[in-house]
UniProtKB/Swiss-Prot annotation:
Disruption phenotype: Abolishes the production of ACT-toxin and impairs the formation of lesions on leaves sprayed with conidia. Does not affect growth rate of cultures, sporulation, and spore germination. Transmembrane segments: none annotated. Abhydrolase domain-containing protein; part of the gene clusters that mediate the biosynthesis of the host-selective toxins (HSTs) ACT-toxins responsible for brown spot of tangerine disease by the tangerine pathotype which affects tangerines and mandarins. ACT-toxins consist of three moieties, 9,10-epoxy-8-hydroxy-9-methyl-decatrienoic acid (EDA), valine and a polyketide. ACT-toxin I is toxic to both citrus and pear; toxin II the 5''-deoxy derivative of ACT-toxin I, is highly toxic to pear and slightly toxic to citrus. The gene is ACTT2-3. Induction: Expression is positively regulated by CSN5 during infection. Belongs to the AB hydrolase superfamily. AKT2 hydrolase family. This is Abhydrolase domain-containing protein ACTT2-3. The keyword Transcription does not apply. It comes from the Eukaryota. It is found in: Peroxisome.
């Protein structure tokens, strides 16, 4: 691939971009990680919490207006321009004809498609369970332990009110208050 390539990822996408940068060291010249789901075990990112949240999250609305209202409420602390972009690119019409402006809409990424990013089976081909739980996710914790292997310049950005930017989280990264 021709450089420069800048990897940009938010939340679990940030974790995946960072992991790719470690496994394919020359792919990115720079990374921008926005509230990346990367952290030590005590932050709880290796548990089923992300998967459970995904399964409870609403993904369909009767109208685009309903979806926009719900997203603006859920992400009310976001910068308005960023929120406008999220709404523009994350909702699509459920109708066959794109000419119809109103009607049912869904998130572009469905809940089960998102879920497979957060959990993986812990049983082997024989069906025998390897761990205590049937599914688990270690990607965010694995990447936390691999942060020292990142070789490209990286902007690691967490919002002031992000759960990934609490005093406890900053302490786990060795960052001063």
């Amino acid at each position: 691939m021709q450089q420069p390539i800048v990897g940009v990822g938010h939340s679990m996408g940030g974790c995946q971009i960072a992991t790719l940068s470690v496994t394919s060291r020359r792919i990115f010249s720079t990374m921008i990680l926005l509230d990346p789901a990367i952290g030590p075990p005590e932050m709880g990112l290796a548990t089923l919490g992300l998967g459970q949240l995904t399964l409870r999250r609403r993904t369909q609305w009767l109208t685009r207006e309903d979806a926009e209202k719900a997203l603006r409420t859920s992400f009310s602390t976001w910068d308005p321009q960023v929120l406008d972009l999220l709404i523009k690119h994350s909702i699509h019409s459920d109708k066959q004809s794109v000419e119809m402006e109103d009607g049912p809409v869904s998130l572009v990424t469905g809940r089960y498609q998102e879920l497979v990013n957060y959990i993986k089976p812990s049983f082997i081909r024989s069906g025998k369970v390897v761990g205590q739980e049937l599914v688990h996710q270690t990607g965010p914790v694995d990447m936390y332990h691999m942060l020292g292997l990142v070789t490209c310049s990286t902007l690691y950005l967490c919002g002031g009110e992000s759960t990934l930017s609490t005093p406890r989280a900053r302490e786990s990264y060795g960052l001063a208050e």
